[in-house]
Amino acid sequence: MLQNSNIRFLFVLMLAFSTSICFSQNNTVSPYSRYGYGEINDNVAGAYRAMGNVGIGMRGKGVINPMQPASYSAVDSLTFMFDLAASGMYTHYEDALGKRNRGGGNLEYLTMQFPIWKYIGLSLGFMPYTMTGYDITLTNSEYPYDTQTYTGTGGFSEIYLGLSYNFFNWAAIGANVYYLFGNVHHQRILSSTLTNYKSISFEDKINADDVRFRYGVQVFHTFDKHSFNIGGIFEAPTKLNGKYKQIDQTNADTLRAEGGFGLPLVYGIGASYTYDNRLTIAVDFLQLQWSQIEYRGEKGNLRDRNKISLGVEYRHNAWSKKYGERMPFRLGLSVQDAYIKQVKDKEFIVSVGMGFPLHNVATILNTSIEYGHRGSSKNLEEHFLRLTLNVAVAERWFFKRKL
């Protein structure tokens, strides 16, 4: 049965969910989002972003982990959870034409999780899948058009529903179903200070939607003060219901086409080790086979993305009366290939963060700061800082009324 306070809590939750949809714009200011679908989101929980974006081998009662659908069955049988995150990003990039800085931010995701049976957990939520956001101006580029402006906005979002079943108390399986939707808009404008030349605009618009699935499995065991968890995830390649339109305002020409878009085969493995509920070490390997899918009707425009993540968390005592001992401290590192062919160098991200417990042990404000580097000074080099804040709330939702 629901408590009265939980009815008010549900109202606030629905309001937050509506707000997240209304303001779910792209949270990237990277010039690299100009290529492909834009920046790719790996569905990492806020608590794990400070741990190098691990998640495949992570399983905990206090974290909603949409990256690994098998983890939902770890939820307590009387607990309702939700997680709301926001982030901000500052980018510094430079090329042969100079140095530039950009900044931006918005709501990141909203996820919920609760038990529907003793060994079954359910999760649902809303989050971005890709993000596009850049605004680049080049001067003295092509006579007589001395200014070129490149802009891009949009991205693809997804709503997911996931189930997980825990059997034998040492293994769990799970699956997510996603509905993906959205659009991406790119524009290039050539302008001139000469009065005899009008501005020229080239536009490129992509619209797509479809349903896809992710499957997960975890095997776990605890003895004495040691806990081990091994997990895996898999997604089959998906062909999107996509349309794109190219507009050349110079000749009033419009090219329209349908199909020719897809999402890659995805697989990943991960493992974590926890000692005495204090120290956790985790490692993930993730591969997305972008080279095998169609983009704009052609294969081979993209390349495979491999990612290795390593993370550490330390919390002295989650039940201590001393506030500092209840705080988790996190550190992480990830190395990955870009899925766009224009970037040959690997991307490196170093992350650090901590959690601030609120009115109970299960409700916590997590913070993470990520520093990343990609590209090279030969073409386009980017340094970025990303700050993520998320509130993970766990409420005692179901109870039996005493007669």
What function would you assign to each model-found segment?
Residues 6, 19-21, 230:
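Compositionally biased regions
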Residues 1-3, 23, 65:
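Intrinsic disorder/low-complexity signature
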Residues 11-20:
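Bacterial N-terminal signal peptides
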Residues 1-11:
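Bacterial N-terminal signal peptides that target proteins for export
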Residues 25-403:
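Subset of outer-membrane beta-barrel
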